[in-house]
UniProtKB/Swiss-Prot annotation:
Organism this protein belongs to: Zymomonas mobilis subsp. mobilis (strain ATCC 31821 / ZM4 / CP4)
Full protein name: Bifunctional protein GlmU
Subcellular location(s) per record: Cytoplasm
Gene Ontology terms: cellular component: cytoplasm; membrane
Catalytic activity field: alpha-D-glucosamine 1-phosphate + acetyl-CoA = N-acetyl-alpha-D-glucosamine 1-phosphate + CoA + H(+); N-acetyl-alpha-D-glucosamine 1-phosphate + UTP + H(+) = UDP-N-acetyl-alpha-D-glucosamine + diphosphate
Recorded name of the encoding gene: glmU
Length: 450
C-alpha cells in the first residue's frame, strides 16, 4: 500500500493532556494493549513515509523513550510553548527543511485513522484540479462540538467555521473538520508563516491555512472518513468509549472470519490477537498482547491469555491462565486453575487442573496430575523442568528444577522430585506410610478426660 508520491508525516503530540489526570502522557495510554501513538505509527508503516516527525512538548521524555522502541524511523522535535496547532506543525520545519514532497498532519490522540484513508488524503492532492489542501472530513452523530466545512457539490471547500461562530444555516451542515490534512511542503511553510493568533485563545490554529489558501484563490477540498476513524481521546471516558468501539469491530471481524463468540460483548482482544477458524470462545475471556489461536480451539470461560501460541484443536480452561512464552501444541488440554508460563506443552499432553507449569517442556501424551508444581525459582535463578513423552505425574507432586523426568516415567502422587528420573521408571519421594492401630481412638479418649 506504499504511497505513490514522496510524503512525510507530522504527528502532533505536544498537548499536556491534563484531562486524563495521569502521570502517563496521554498518547501513551493504551488502546487494546497498544499506546495511542503506536496506532498512528502503525497506520503509517505500510505507506512508507520518507520522514515521520513527532512534535512533542509536555512530557516529551516519556514520548521520546517510547519512540526508541518502535520500528519506524522517527524524528522528534519540541514545541516549547503550547501556542496552537499551526505553531506545533511549524516546529517540524527544521526536520523537513530539505523535503520537497507532500506532508500529512496527524494527531497522536486520534489513533484509528486507517492507512487507506491517509493514502486517499495524500492522493487527493494529485487529482486534476491540484488542490492546495486536502482536509479529512467526517459526519459525527452529534456535530455540536465540531467546526463545520461548507463545500460545493464537488467537495471543494468554500468556508470553514467554528460551531460557536456558525450561522443557523451553517450549523445545519453535518460535515465537520477532523483536523487531519494533507498539503505540499512548498505550500505549507509559507501559509503557516501567515497564520495569526488574533482569537480568544491567542493561539495559532492549523485550519486557518485553509482559509488563507482560499483567500489567494487557491483550492481546498475534503476527503470523507468514517467518524470512528477520527475519534480522538481527551479523557479516560473517551478512551473507554474508543476501546469499546474497537472491541466491537474486532469481535465482528473475528466472527466473520469463522470463530464463534458465545457472548461477544464479554470477550476482550488486544490489537494483535490472531484467531483461527472454528474456534469457540465462551464468555468472559481476555486476550492480552501477542496471542495466536489456531483452528478448532475451544477456550472456556474466565480464561486469561497473553503471549501464548495455541495450536490446532487445543482445549483451554475454564479459569486457565496462559502467560508469555506458553506454547500449546495440537490437541493438548489445559484445564481449570492451571497456569502456564515460558513452557511448551507438546501434542496431546494434559494439564487438567490446579497446576503451575513454568520454564518447562511437557512431552507429547504426558499427563500432569492435579496439584503438580514445577518449582522453577530458587530465589535467584530460574531453572527448567523437562518431562518426556507419555510420562505420568501423580497428583500433588513438586518437581524441583533443574530436573528431567524421562519418557514413560511415573511419579508417585505426593512426591517431591529433586533428581532426574530415567525413562520408564517409577519415582517415589515421600515418607513410607505407617499405620498405628487404635491410636486415634486412644487419642480421643485422652482428650475427653481433660
Amino acid at each position: 500500500m506504499t504511497a505513490h508520491k514522496p510524503f512525510s508525516a507530522v504527528i502532533l503530540a505536544a498537548g499536556k493532556g491534563t484531562r486524563m489526570r495521569s502521570d502517563t502522557h496521554k498518547i501513551l495510554h493504551a488502546l487494546a494493549g497498544r499506546p495511542l501513538l503506536g496506532w498512528v505509527l502503525d497506520s503509517l508503516a505500510p505507506l512508507s513515509p520518507d520522514h515521520t516527525v513527532v512534535v512533542t512538548g509536555s512530557g516529551r521524555e516519556q514520548v521520546e523513550n517510547y519512540l526508541k522502541q518502535v520500528d519506524l524511523p522517527v524524528t522528534s522535535v519540541t514545541q516549547e510553548e503550547q501556542l496552537g496547532t499551526a505553531h506545533a506543525v511549524a516546529q517540524a520545519k527544521s526536520a523537513l527543511k530539505d523535503f520537497k514532497g507532500d506532508i500529512v498532519v496527524l494527531y497522536g490522540d486520534v489513533p484509528l485513522v486507517q492507512p487507506k484513508t491517509i493514502k486517499a488524503l495524500l492522493e487527493r492532492l494529485h487529482h486534476e484540479d491540484k488542490p492546495t489542501v486536502a482536509v479529512l472530513a467526517f459526519r459525527p452523530d452529534d456535530p455540536r462540538q465540531y467546526g463545520r466545512i461548507v463545500t460545493d457539490k464537488t467537495a471543494h471547500i468554500q468556508k470553514m467555521v467554528e460551531y460557536k461562530d456558525a450561522s443557523e444555516e451553517e450549523r445545519a451542515i453535518t460535515l465537520c473538520n477532523s483536523g487531519l490534512l494533507a498539503i505540499r511542503a512548498h505550500d505549507l511553510w509559507p501559509l503557516l508563516s501567515r497564520v495569526q493568533n488574533n482569537n480568544a485563545s491567542g493561539e495559532y490554529y492549523l485550519p486557518d491555512i485553509v482559509m488563507l489558501a482560499l483567500s489567494e484563490g487557491r483550492q481546498a477540498v475534503t476527503v470523507d472518513a468514517e467518524a470512528w476513524e477520527v475519534s480522538g481521546v481527551n479523557n479516560r471516558a473517551e478512551l473507554a468509549s474508543l476501546e469499546s468501539l474497537w472491541q466491537n469491530r474486532k469481535r465482528q471481524d473475528v466472527m466473520k472470519d469463522g470463530a464463534s463468540l458465545i457472548a461477544p460483548e464479554t470477550v476482550w482482544f488486544s490489537y494483535d490477537t490472531e484467531i483461527g477458524r472454528d474456534v469457540i470462545i465462551e464468555p468472559q475471556v481476555y486476550f492480552g498482547r501477542n496471542v495466536k489461536v489456531a483452528n478448532g480451539v475451544t477456550i472456556h470461560s474466565f480464561s486469561h491469555i497473553e503471549g501464548a501460541d495455541i495450536k490446532e484443536n487445543v482445549e483451554i480452561g475454564p479459569f486457565a491462565r496462559l502467560r508469555p512464552g506458553a506454547e500449546i501444541a495440537e490437541k493438548a488440554k489445559i484445564g481449570n486453575f492451571v497456569e502456564i508460563k515460558k513452557s511448551k506443552i507438546e501434542k496431546g499432553a494434559k494439564v487438567n487442573h490446579l497446576t503451575y507449569i513454568g520454564d518447562a517442556t511437557i512431552g507429547a501424551g504426558s499427563n500432569i496430575g492435579g496439584g503438580t508444581i514445577t518449582c522453577n525459582y530458587d530465589g535467584f535463578n530460574k531453572s527448567r523442568t523437562e518431562i518426556g513423552e507419555k510420562a505420568f505425574i501423580g497428583s500433588n507432586s513438586a518437581l524441583v528444577a533443574p530436573v528431567r523426568i524421562g519418557a514413560g516415567a511415573i511419579i508417585a502422587a505426593g512426591s517431591t522430585i529433586t533428581h532426574n528420573v530415567p525413562d520408564d521408571s517409577l519415582a517415589i519421594a515421600r515418607s513410607e506410610q505407617e499405620n498405628k492401630a487404635l491410636w486415634a481412638k486412644k487419642f480421643r479418649q485422652r482428650k475427653k478426660k481433660k
